[in-house]
Amino acid sequence: MKLKNVFGLFIVAGLALGLAGCGGANKTVDKSSGAAEGGAKVVRIAHTQAYVPYDFVNDKGESDGFEVAVLQEVQKLLPQYKFEFVPTSDDDLLIGVESGKYDLGTKGAWLTEARKEKFIFPKEPVGASVIGLVYRKDNADQIKDIESFAKFSGKLVPIAPQNAQYNVIEAFNKTHADTPIKLVSSEAFTVADAYTWVLEGRYDAYIDIELSYKSNVEKETGSYHNLADKLSFVRYKAIPTYPVFNKKNQQLADDYDKAIQQLKDSGKIKELENKYFGEDLFQYCCPFCQQRLLW
């Protein structure tokens, strides 16, 4: 009888350990699926590492930038989530969000039809990216803005049809039928090609992202700073930028939209724009840009 009691104790203890082990396994699965202590869902946010001032890693090794700061403010309005920011490459960001490695990613991205097939785009943009014309300094007296460029010659470096910039020029031509810009479609080419073609006189302007021009040409360490005394840049419009969400995160995207609207209403977005850009970039967004721009 004593021996049977001993065996019985071992069996009971074994069952207890087994049940405890099962309970521990469930907790591990919950954490990996996004559950955090306190009931908040962990949201992994990928961002690029050197796209200053939109998304970057600062001198302290911290995630920083306008879009990161906006999302940090979004986090404050959504206590049901716990945001974790992960600096990474462009490719890993897009592949990771699509695969579910990350819940969302932010990289100063424009809305595109191709990306809409892979990701959820929220209704509210997180920021804006200014574009304009790069032209020869020799023509500074004739080219003051996009309208004067159109009258000067309208000879623009070709643009890929799927590029948002193509739609921008297309929209301009619809409202300037008498002096349209010569809009020619083309396959991809390098920035170096575009700058060279403008300097050679093959074309009279190239539509570029202002931040890229500043980094490439105006900055002393820029790859094409040697062209700074030959090229100039003039602003035109701003194109909205969006975070991209994994296809399974519609609720997160909806919650993001509500929070962004609150931040706009409170003036927080404008405050952060002034901090990182020194001005409100949304003021340069045209109605067409807000509604339909593809990249």
Where are these regions (language model features)?
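Bilobed "Venus flytrap"/periplasmic-binding protein-like clamshell domains
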Residues: 49-52, 61-76, 133-190, 210-212
